[in-house]
Structure formats: C-alpha cells, structure tokens
UniProtKB/Swiss-Prot annotation:
Keywords: Calcium, Capsid protein, Intermediate capsid protein, Metal-binding, Ubl conjugation, Virion, Zinc. Zn(2+) binds at residue 153. Homotrimer. Interacts with the inner capsid protein VP2. Interacts with the outer capsid glycoprotein VP7. Interacts with the outer capsid protein VP5*. GO terms for cellular component: viral envelope; viral intermediate capsid. This is Intermediate capsid protein VP6. GO terms for biological process: fusion of virus membrane with host plasma membrane.
Amino acid sequence: MEVLYSISKTLKDARDKIVEGTLYSNVSDIIQQFNQIIVTMNGNEFQTGGIGTLPIRNWTFDFGLLGTTLLNLDANYVETARTTIEYFIDFIDNVCMDEMTRESQRNGIAPQSDALRKLSGIKFKRINFDNSSEYIENWNLQNRRQRTGFVFHKPNIFPYSASFTLNRSQPLHNDLMGTMWLNAGSEIQVAGFDYSCAINAPANTQQFEHIVQLRRALTTATITILPDAERFSFPRVINSADGATTWFFNPVILRPNNVEVEFLLNGQIINTYQARFGTIIARNFDTIRLSFQLMRPPNMTPAVNALFPQAQPFQHHATVGLTLRIDSAVCESVLADSNETMLANVTAVRQEYAVPVGPVFPPGMNWTELITNYSPSREDNLQRVFTVASIRSMLIK
C-alpha cells in the first residue's frame, strides 16, 4: 500500500510540474524520483481486472529513463515524459479499481488483488516512500493492530432511522402524545409532542427522552445543540404503527424546557450539559442521551390560548424539539464524512463494473446497513478500500 501511494504521489508531482519551459533544475528531484520508480518497475509484469465486468489487462514495464538537461524542458522532452507518466497513471488507476472491487472475511486490511500483493514485495521497497497521507498512516497502524485515529467532519456515524413512539394514543388518533425522530449522517433531530399541550400532565409538564447508541466511539467531538427540530415543524400525515390508518400532525412549536444532553461511554457519563445551546464538546462517548420537557405556558395571550384549548378537538399540537449535529470528531474506525468522496468513489467503481456481492459488504455498499452492522471484517476491508480510493483520487478526479 505504501508503494502504491508513493508511486501515485510521485506521478501527481511529475504530471503537474514537468511542463514545457520549466527549468530542469526546478524539477530535477521529481525526475530523479520518477527515474527510481522506472528502474524498479522495469522488467516486471502485472495483471489487473477479471472481477465483474472489469476487464483483464496485462501490464509490462520497459521504459527508458528521463534524461538531464542544463536548460528548460522542451516539447520533445515533455512529450516523452508524458507518455511514460500516463502509462503509469493508467496502471495505478487499474490497480486501485481492482483493489476496490475485492473483499475478504479474513485480514481484509491486507492487499487483496494480485497486482497490489506483488507491489508489496521486497523488490519494490527501493521506491522512495512518502507516508504523509492520513489514510496511509492509519493503514500502517491498523495493519500492525495499533490504535488508529481519523479526523472527520460531519461523520456519517448515525444509521438512518426515522420513526415515532406514542406514550398516549387512541383508535381515533385525536389526542396523541409521544416522540418522533430522524437520525441520519451526523445529525439527530427529535421532537416531543402533546396534542393537549400537557393539560392533564403533572405540573402541566411532559418529559421526553431520546437515546442513540453509536456503532463506534468518538473522541474530541465538536457538537452543535439547537433548541429546535425544524424537520418536525410543519404539518404532515403519518402512517400509524400498524399501517392500518394515518394520523394528522399539526405542530405549534414551543421552546423546550430543562434540556439535558449526556454523553456516555460504556454506560458511564463522561459529559453532561444542561440548558446549554450552540457549540459544545464531548471527550469520549458511544451513547448520546437527550432529555427535555414540554411545559404548558402558564400565561397565554388569547391568541395562544385559542391554540391550546382545555378539551377536544385539538387542532394544533404543542411540540418541542432538539437538534444535535456532530461537526467534527476523531474515530478509530474509518467512516464516510462530508469532506471526502471515498464512499462514492468505491461504490461507483463497484457499480460501474457490476461487481458481485461478496462476503463482507452489503449490496450497493448501502451505508446504513454497513454502519448498522459494522463488524471488524467490514472495518478492515473498508479502511483498505478507502485508503486505495484516497490514492486513486490524487490522480483520477
């Protein structure tokens, strides 16, 4: 894997900097690195593809070295260099695609394609290594079963979940009380509602709670908390739990009371925030507990009083909500996030070449299913294919 990254980094630099008119002295280091790669690769043969519709391709290396000059690089020099560079780039692209289509239930962190296994051989250790990539650094750590650490922005840590629970209901669904939520990506939105606006609740107050367990623990997280859940702020028709009917939800938004956010790790509370909104931090957690209250306003203008009558029909439904968004965090496991295209890159290649469903990844690389059942085997394979995708993205956009 280090060889693949180092070759790709050198190729990217060579493609970007070896241009007509450039002084040789300005690019001599890159040219010497590329020549080292040529010397190491010459005389070797590789084969890629042969899975799904990814075609089998054979690769042979027999290239002359790029020469030296005291002057600027001319058109002939650049054309010769480009021909060699483009062949190497095409080779790396196919090695990456081959690797991204393969998976293994055992030791999925290790190279799975014949080409990348061959590149891992001792003869290629002469290539000048560049391990500056976060993915390569963490791949090396994971390969040695040491602790890894990925920095994510808006990590897709929450499997998609959208549902509701009713603490009070009737066959007519005309006086409901309960909780509804939407968990997806890096965001939780949860709303508590009471058609009667807590008229018969103790102290005219309803208590709500929403607990979310993460599939992987996060550390040093920066989080935003807002006293609102905008996705539940407009009228909607909702299917009943048994699917036999539908019911109408017509929210009127109140501010939540006694808001408490707890971050837990292995059942132990690590951080607690009460009535704190905006930006907060959480040190280390695998569970989030949100609790909040809906309190019937003790004093209301006639217009507000008309919204919340003391008897049916309840045409407007008192609602309070919270939004929790993970803006950034560190995780030992690889995840998809908003800053990178690794999941899309891997999925696109597997779809384009009709890669059959293997023993590890779900059909279509369905992220919700993948993260819901994030086994060690999936973690190893995902880190490997994401590392390869990060290498490919340097050369192929």
